[in-house]
Amino acid sequence: MFDLNGKTALVTGASGGIGAAIARALHAAGAVVALSGTRKEALEALAGELNGRTHILPCNLSQKDETEKLVPAAEAAMGGLDILVNNAGITRDMLFMRLKDEDWDAVINVNLTSAFRLSRAALRGMMKKRFGRIIQITSVVGVTGNPGQGNYAAAKAGMIGMSKSLAGEVASRGVTVNCVAPGFIESPMTEALTDAQKEAILRMVPAGRLGTGADVAAACVYLASAEAAYVTGQTLHVNGGMAMI
């Protein structure tokens, strides 16, 4: 099950923890993986770790021109694109009354608009071959909201609404569009928390632990697979029960 041999995948934000975990999991399932991100050294290190069946495609998704070249570059490198994982994201947290226009715009641009552009670019090839998987990495806060993250929550909620709309347009052509919404995931940020802060977080999570990149990646492998062909327009929450939605 969940065999991705012969499939090609593009993962954005692959120079970060969750993106790298997703790339590893897709690669382990047999896919050829294009690794995209802003930190070329991290992408090269990941490609070296995976040791074959990878392509490095650095891209700054805040730049429209770079974003619009990414899918064609991935298709050229791999001979097509079967799986798109829009994982890249940034934060510019601030209380709403103090949130600057430029910080709102930056988060919406990278987290939502780039996902729109990449999804749109990938559709033609996917629809032609009558197979495609578009997976958006959203967040639990896109459903619940979170004080101080109005811009981030809006972008992630926008991804969910966009994906539902797109899923209805392309389902008959063998293309599925789904979201994965992580909760609290282990990261350099969570490692810097005090014990008291970690305990407060864990009290919110019935599973009693933080999630890992591998937890998120496993959901992506499922949604990318042939076994998930009848699943579209959905949001798969990976949060240890923190929000039962």
Predicted features and spans:
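Substrate-binding pocket helix/loop in short-chain dehydrogenase/reductase
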Residues: 95-96, 100-108, 190, 201
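Conserved glycine-rich Rossmann-like NAD(P)H-binding loop of the short-chain dehydrogenase/reductase
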Residues: 29-46
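Residue(s) in the substrate-gating loop at a strand-loop-helix junction
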Residues: 139
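Active-site helix of classical SDR
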Residues: 119, 155, 163
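Short, small/polar-rich loop/turn modules that mediate ligand/substrate recognition or access, typified
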Residues: 171, 176, 231-233, 239
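Alpha-helical segment proximal to the catalytic Tyr-Lys
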Residues: 124, 168-172, 229
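Conserved glycine-rich cofactor-binding loop
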Residues: 8, 15-16
